[in-house]
């Protein structure tokens, strides 16, 4: 049994008690990819994926890429690169980085643009059910049918709203405004009501929205629909960085309830990585890129080990010392695993599995391998007790459970 921290209940839970595990991790908006904050999040859920597989579960992992969104459009305008080209470039770079870092790819990886027809149907369904409403648009917006207006979710139709993040009203209002919300939009029933369908605006991309009119999807409904179509509703777990807890996961779960049977049973969040004293973020520009480290000749497995040295729920600051420690650990492990025989690995494997089963405790798992490596490299150890093939057993376990290729 793999127990993880459920952000909604602040308890450790078995997120997938049956023979299957279905989970969704919110993907990137493809500009400034892939920084170490991204990598830390996706390596966290890769550990969970591996632990579930090792436990014998049939795992289905679904993710998305938000390949049309305001920040992407703003970056494209600022750089003069067409937004589709920018999204494609950054998405491919993200794929390359994840492959280099040993992250198992999702079974289904859907772009926001690709999901537009499904989102249109979902928003129409919410309108018909009274879970959404139209808001008039400003002059010049709305294309050939401005009277249709933008569409917003009506949170008053969801009595369970707020149960994911469990925040007070003032905190929700503050975070909603900080993280892409529009609390002051005229015509909304409630300041927190989130956008479902944004009507066409001059200079912005738009798609056929059938009865909604031309436009593009809101952020939260995209993930709700992609998760529904890839996993079915409800599903076991939704994850991402802790900054997605509210409003994104709160809103997408609310939308999933409006679409029928609810969203994720468990919400799991990775802590944020800081750099130069601030959270690593695109807006601040204090980013360390996986691709830049790779281009500088850094072994991706050293990057992975540097990230795994911190518990996924902790918030911490990246420094050069983290990378140096990752490189040193990688070199020591490779040295310890170079022989045909070595110390018995039975307890080491059990310790790795136990650590991951206890809230994905990667530092403890690394410590178990360190202890085996220290013994293997000890020139004074009793080699008469060595087990033939033990280094291979440890190497395969490190690969399968920790995602570190040696």
Features from the language model and the residues they span:
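Structural preference for alpha-helix termini/caps and helix-kink/transition segments
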Residues: 279-282, 286-406
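NTP-dependent nucleotidyl-transfer catalytic core
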Residues: 1-253, 257-268, 282, 328, ...
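Basic helix-turn-helix/winged-helix DNA-binding cores
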Residues: 273-274
